[in-house]
Amino acid sequence: MQKPSGKGLKYFAYGVAISAAGAILAEYVRDWMRKPKAKS
């Protein structure tokens, strides 16, 4: 699975992973702030 252009692919994978994590985290925080401690 090793390719000569693996560095670019690795950076691309990191970018996608960070973007996905950021989007999921933003949605979670937004939903959490919308309902303030419903089940505490």
Swiss-Prot record:
Transmembrane spans: 10-29
Topology term for the membrane: Single-pass membrane protein
Domain of life: Viruses
Record keywords, A-Z: Capsid inner membrane protein, Membrane, Transmembrane, Transmembrane helix, Virion
Any one Gene Ontology cellular component term annotated for this protein: viral inner membrane
Record bears the keyword Cell membrane: no
Predominant cellular place of this UniProt entry's protein: virion
Subcellular location: Virion membrane
Role this protein plays: May interact with the viral DNA.
Protein name: Protein P4
Species name: Pseudoalteromonas phage PM2 (Bacteriophage PM2)
Lineage per the UniProt record: Viruses, Varidnaviria, Bamfordvirae, Preplasmiviricota, Tectiliviricetes
Name of the coding gene: IV
